[in-house]
């Protein structure tokens, strides 16, 4: 067969595959085991019959951008919606990386970071977590100084260790590096949320959203983007929806790589409904955190080393 041109960075890239598991209890994707809250399920069933499936969705998902922006007290242009937050991760590697550039990623962490870096044509440079799975800010800052990456990715809480890195650590890194920073906060809803900026005067429902998150630093720094997802705490993994929040400058550049009508209308409707009813999920999240801690204590009694998790999973050694 004739040899066709294929980008160099793709020639040795394999298809990413995930094993299909036929089981009653499935844990390998960190999904929620909870269905939609009953009142939201009833509302969904009523709207589905007459939903305007024949119409395109909002071009840039403006309907969802606006409600998130209102909560975060930012311009709606500072928000971008995507097919899961991993979609924005890929776009960020494409926009801020590319041939001849380096992207700094944590190890051990989410396997897809390396995939996205490779697809963008960038070179990965790894920074190691400490023995307990936490980020050492000085190590990351030094790596950025030496390697000069065009993008730095931080996973907080980290997957697969579950470690939550304090706002002080995150802010030290953000304020010290010269490249854009991606904060992947897919599991932040499960973190303790024990840290709040001391002078934050937002109402309680808005404080809960940003507790422990780099979202609370928006407006103070312009070099980072926070990614969040509806797949984990909110149980919409099957609909694929996430969002990014950052400075107007970074988000406008990121938006250039996003196609029009990129998130389907029903996903946007459901994500907006869930977002506007976040309070319904607090009890579930609390239960998951409590059961996680019980299981961690039990595993420690059995002699396992359990990484200190602030996510909805545990890593044992």
Show the residue positions of the predicted features.
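N-terminal "arm"/small-domain region of PLP-dependent enzymes with the aminotransferase-like
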Residues: 1-55, 148
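Conserved PLP-binding active-site segment of the aspartate aminotransferase-like
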Residues: 28, 246, 315-317
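PLP-dependent aminotransferase class I/II
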Residues: 37, 223-300, 304-307
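Phosphate-binding glycine-rich loop
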Residues: 62-102
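PLP-dependent aminotransferase-like
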Residues: 95-154
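Active-site pre-lysine segment of PLP-dependent enzymes
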Residues: 135-147, 160-181, 185-231
